[in-house]
Amino acid sequence: LLEKLIPELRRRGYRVGVVKHHAHADFEFDVPGKDTWRMAQAGAEAVAIASPGKIGLVRRVEREPALDEVVTLFADSVDIVLTEGYKWAGKPKIEVSRAARSTTLICDPSELLAVVADHPLNLPVPQFDLDDIVGLADLIERRFLRTA
């Protein structure tokens, strides 16, 4: 869903950031054997790589940072931050539901901004088909991006 939503929001002129939650204690962001990977393996607390087109940062932490802490790392360079995961973060959520997996939602409807599904659900929130990226982007734009 995010891979379709990001280009639609960018087409509308918005700068989009994404934070993905990874539930496991460790992950590989860098390529094993490359300089930055070797520096991290050697014990660097933080490793950044910068080029004319990108910046990447990996920093060791003693506890999992809250979503708002992660967002502050790049919030000044984007118009909106979308997340994957962070069910407990207290932010408006868009849940994706596929009938082949389950028709039971994970989130309580009171936490939902919308549902994107391939099957009908009787909920008090907007529902979009899996392919209705324009409609979903319209909702996000109205709710979070347009200023009065």
Show which residues each predicted segment covers:
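Charged helix-capping and loop-helix junction motifs
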Residues: 33, 63-67, 98-100
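Short coil/turn connectors at secondary-structure junctions
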Residues: 12-15, 44-45, 76-78, 90-91, ...
